[in-house]
Amino acid sequence: MELSEPKQRFESLLSLFEDVANKRYSGDFSVKKNINAPQVPPRSYSLFNVTGGNVSSYNNQQQQQNNNNNNNNNNNNNNNNNNNNNNNNNNSGEISSNNSTPSILFSPTPTSTAPPAPPQPTTPPNTGFHNRPLSININQQPIGGVNNNNNNNNKDSPSNKPLRLSGSPPTASINGNQIEQLQRELRNEKEAHQQTKYLLNSFADENKKLSNDCQLWRAKYFKLLTKNTKLKVIFDHFQSIMNESDSVPGEGSLVHSTSYNSSSSSSSGGGGNITPRKLSLAGGGKFDDAPQSASALLKIHHQRNQSTGSAFSNTIYNGEEKTRDTISYNERPKRQTVGSSTFFPPPPSRATSTSSIQVNSDPQEIEQLTEEQYLEMLEKRRQVSLQILQTEKEYAFYLNIIVEEFLQPLKNESNLSNNPFISKAQVKQLFGDTEVILGSSKLLAEDLENVLLDGTSNPIGLGDCFLKICDYFKLYASYVKNYYTSISVLNKLKEESHKFQAFIQEKEQILLDSNFTDLGALLVLPVSRIGQYTSMINYLFSLTPQSHPDYEPFKKAVIKMKSTVDYVKEKIRDNDSQNKVRIIQNQMTGKFENLNLPHRRYVREGMLTESGKGSNSNQYYCFLFNDIFVLSTPIKKSNQFSFKKKISLSEAEVTMISDPEDRPIFQISIQNIDSQQDNSPNMLSLNGIQNAINNMTNNDSKSKNNNNNNSNGNNNNNNINSNSNSNNNSVIDIKSSGVLINNGGGSGFISNNNGITNVNSNNNNNNNINSNNNINGNNNNGNNSVNYSNGEDNNDRECFTFIADSNRDREDWIQAIHANIISSKKRNETRKPEDIEKGGIDFSVSDIKLCEQIGSGGSGCTVHRCTVDGFTCAVKVLKLKNTSPFLVEQFISEITIMVKLSHQNIAKYLGHRLSGNQLWLFMEFYPHSLKDVITKRTSPFPATEVIWMALEIAKGLEFLHTQKNPIIHRDLKPGNIMCSLDDKGRVCSIRVCDFDTSKELGNGVTLKTCIGTPCYMAAEVLNVADGGNSGYSLKADIWSFAMLCFEIISLLPPYHQFQHLQSIEMIINGTCPPLPTDLIQPKLLQPLIELLVTCIDLNPNHRPNASQLVQKLTKMLKNTGMMTE
């Protein structure tokens, strides 16, 4: 159906209704007869709802009104009904202006009983047809008569006149079905439009979702790409280490083969047509036969590395001639990228290290290369050299940032400021030799630029450049060793100094446009760069023909560089191992001796199951160090371990045995306690230490004699007895490597390589025992065991049998334990008694660095933190010049006392030495003193912590007082109690220290020297000057212990609110120091306070001794519910 005809009909209907509305306001309701107008039905039909087009009789009006709430017109009685008896009668007739009113037709609500207002002759108001609040459905054709419901009985009223409709199309031309069809089409169009809109919104949402998914996948891709690159770097590093471990290079062991050497089979035949060997690079690119562009030489991945990776990516010049310019280290290089690989790709596998570089001494080798191949080789050598120059410039640029932006301003702050937030010592610890390293980097870059940018295609002198700079690479050793200290100082300053933190944050803003986030990421650059120099030199060496003038300098540079890097790597491994020992020390709980010793190194750890009788088996988490084997049990829901047992490897043997159930079992045996000699460092004779002290006081600097190592010819040939019984069980005791055996009537040979011995045991007369990491037992009902022993009787040994996770795990454990048993025994054979007493520090070769001052001693000495071969410890330094002999003797007495002490609550003695005019005493380092903790604390300690701290101090005091010759401390106070803090800030690892005023007491000996800190001194110590006083003894420490505990409770020194003379008088009278009233948990503290009051009794005999204190404090701690060991 076409749309033009219905449209015309709509327009006609609209004009009709507009005319009717206009005539209503003008008062002219006469409608002329129109032939084309639709015929109005008789008046028996009422047009009661124009909007709906529904026509019904009056009898149906009430029902229609109930069903349709939208009908706004209520039908009333017929206008022609003048009688009250004819209310329900409907009259029919033609519509005229005398009995019909258009106001009823268009009124949205039923009309009121009041007569309508007279028509206005003026212009119709704004409430025209289109502005009236009536919703008219013009899609329906008005049919039927108009029912006038006006209640006005005046027939002559204009409102009662009949109405003639005109201007409408004929009835025959208006089809209701067509209108309804048009409506449906319009509705369909509208629905189609809404559906299209919905689809567009759906597509937009789906597009957004796909975009987010693409971003996620892109992030995952780059993450996997980063992991892949890191794994490749690790693999290349592992491959280089494996190649380096093949052999140790020497001057005469280098056999060079050029990069274009073919295989031995190719080179054996004559002729010059030899295919050049392709060199694979780390980035995925490779050198082909012809020179390639930079993009083909190396594939660069731009990745961000914030901490430990290399600083720069693998960049290469494009081979074009560069104009020579001045090196600037203040301008950022053009290419700044960060890669997780090295600055420079590692050389090929045949040239990864010095040990794998082969230099052929055949002078005819160079003649095998054609001229074209030789020139290509030199060109690639030049390209690699340009790449090294570029990366060296970038490296120097970032070093210059460290020096100019950080180091120099901090130096000025420490030197010129009246109140510096950083000291000179901290600046030195933080940056080390960065300035010297920057100078060496600039020197290398300038030398390389002078050689490479001279316009020649065959630069000569590269070998001399690296040989010259190799001596400077030794500076990296001290920097790498100091790196961990540098990072710890940096973190500590950030935490403690707001000014330093603000300074660092301000300076780090210049790194926003780089790939480094902070100063710590810059400080790691020299650590990673030193390893890259080796790859650079080795790679250039592999590209240098033997006939080239740079060959010999490069060979010397390779040897020098390898020795330097090996030393640096060894120090890095030592630092990592020592850090691991410190971590294990903090994770261990229970009663155990200090694990953190200078010579101790971490080896491995893992879970082992102890094989017990029947079904009894205990699981231990074992830690293997280079001198001890520690058994512990993991604590559930914690990263801590409970200490169980320590096995000294110098007295141990490891045994690999087979099991009928084919379980991976091995055994560790140690000498029984009854038969062991106490070789504890602090329990040895004091002759060695006393001699050392005498030498120091006499300023004797004579060198010590070398150790005499006597060896006999039977070291490598020992007998092994294999006795066979009825079950064909064979046991082989291996006492050394390379031994002959005699098994019954047969003979065989056993070889032991790398600490791993494998036994092939057969019932033949001839037995061969090879080192193949397997044990094959072909005996009937037989068990084989291999014992690593020192020839002692096994009846006096205690055995521990463990089950490993697998055979491979068992072999790894046995290999590691056996290797460290051998090294531990060798160290004990060569160490002197005084060296053992010093805790394993060899001061003659140790690298000792004095760090910041952390305190001062009572004998005129200073206390510093220091590092001994990277191991952090505390040192007391006494200057002998212009120092009274009394103070020197006091210092020596402290050393003599500390040598004898070994307890978990006593500071550990590590060693001493005489250096020039200074006497050094090395002790275990603790970061805090109890005085520092009390001063910084803002709220009182909980009662359980107070009791625990008092118990730990009492244990240390008990150890001193119960020695064979009791030791009195005489200066017990918070400043002489060292401690650590756990991750929650609670006090832990309490140690009693500072024994410069301590004294050994004999039986019945009393002291009469007034010494100590006044507010902590006992009354009898203050009265020692009186003639009637008989002196004091160990009970004076009990008084000082009470005063120390009063300060822990109140967080204030005893008698702090009184003047000095008043406090002395109160002490002499035995008055207890006042305590604050706002104590935490006073009921729990009440027993402790009562105990402390007994400790300050004026009669020393009425005071409890140290052992009684420990017993009572332990009982108090149990009553609080706090677990103790």
UniProtKB/Swiss-Prot annotation:
Spans annotated as Disordered: 50-175, 247-287, 322-362, 693-729, 761-791
Domain of life assignment: Eukaryota
Residues reported in the UniProt entry to bind ATP: I854, G855, S856, G857, G858, S859, G860, C861, T862, K876
InterPro entries: DBL_dom_sf, DH_dom, FYVE_RhoGEF_PH, Kinase-like_dom_sf, PH-like_dom_sf, PH_domain, Prot_kinase_dom, Ser/Thr_kinase_AS
Gene3D superfamilies xref list: Dbl homology (DH) domain (1.20.900.10), Phosphorylase Kinase, domain 1 (3.30.200.20), Pleckstrin-homology domain (PH domain)/Phosphotyrosine-binding domain (PTB) (2.30.29.30), Transferase(Phosphotransferase) domain 1 (1.10.510.10)
The protein's required cofactors: Mg(2+)
UniProt entry keywords in alphabetical sequence: ATP-binding, GTPase activation, Kinase, Magnesium, Metal-binding, Nucleotide-binding, Serine/threonine-protein kinase, Transferase
Enzyme class, first EC level, given as a word: transferase
Disulfide bonds: none
Domain (PH) ranges: 601-822
Compositionally biased spans, kind Polar residues: 92-106
Record-given protein name: Kinase and exchange factor for Rac B
